Amino acid sequence: MDNEAFTMGYFRLLAAKLSPHGYEPKQLVDAIWAGTAAMVKNDGTRSNEDAFWKKFAGVYGEKALADKPLFDEFYENDFQTAKAFCGVNPKAAETVHTLKEMGLRAALATNPIFPAVATESRIRWAGLEPEDFELRTTYENIGYCKPNPDYYREIAARLGVRPEECLMVGNDVTEDMIAQSIGMQVFLLTDCLINKERKDISLYPRGSFLQLLDHIETHQCHSKSAERQE
């Protein structure tokens, strides 16, 4: 997915929805970014939802809280048009289905800056269902964001596993590969690579969706071999 195209399209849709209700587009976008920054800085003491709305209401006052149903309505309806800004790679859904057929557990570790209704829509746009994932992080159900390592610690804790038992698969070098710092195994998808800081990607196992499956199958074989030796 082209993140820039999606973000621009998303803001256009949101401004079109809210400008008739007194939200000037530029100020609205600035306030959304400020709320997003508050979520990224969140330390787990509150939900990302609460962090966002506290900051957003700091710009618009109580009006913002009173207008929250407008935002809910936007995500239920207008936001669905944003699918046009998302490039869908069918290999993503195919890979998730294959992993589940292999008996592996799947969690959607997407940056939790959107409400559940938006996240679930994006899952369906990708050809999957929310129920395909044991856990889906949204701004309502977690108090951290990427690239905070505590975000990944929280996911492992909720799944009831040690970080070392997890494989974080992602395409963003900065936001996803940080999971390695808490002991998670990682795999960098290079089909749609994001590397804004131009980091050395040779440090990570990496490749396409097909190579990801090969990587997992190889790892499983090694694990089973080690178990037999024990």
Model-assigned labels for residue ranges:
Residues D2-A5, D43, D200-I201:
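Short, solvent-exposed loop/turn segments at secondary-structure boundaries
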Residues S47-A51, L65-P69, E76-A107:
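Short, acidic loop-to-helix structural element flanking the phosphoryl-transfer center
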Residues A109-N111:
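A cross-family glycoside hydrolase active-site/sugar-binding cleft signature
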Residues A93, H97-T98, I113-F114, T119-E230:
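Asp-based, Mg2+/Mn2+-dependent phosphohydrolase catalytic module
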Residues T7-A15, I32-T36, W53, F71-A82, ...:
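Hydrophobic alpha-helical core bundles mediating ligand binding, dimerization, or RNAP-core interactions
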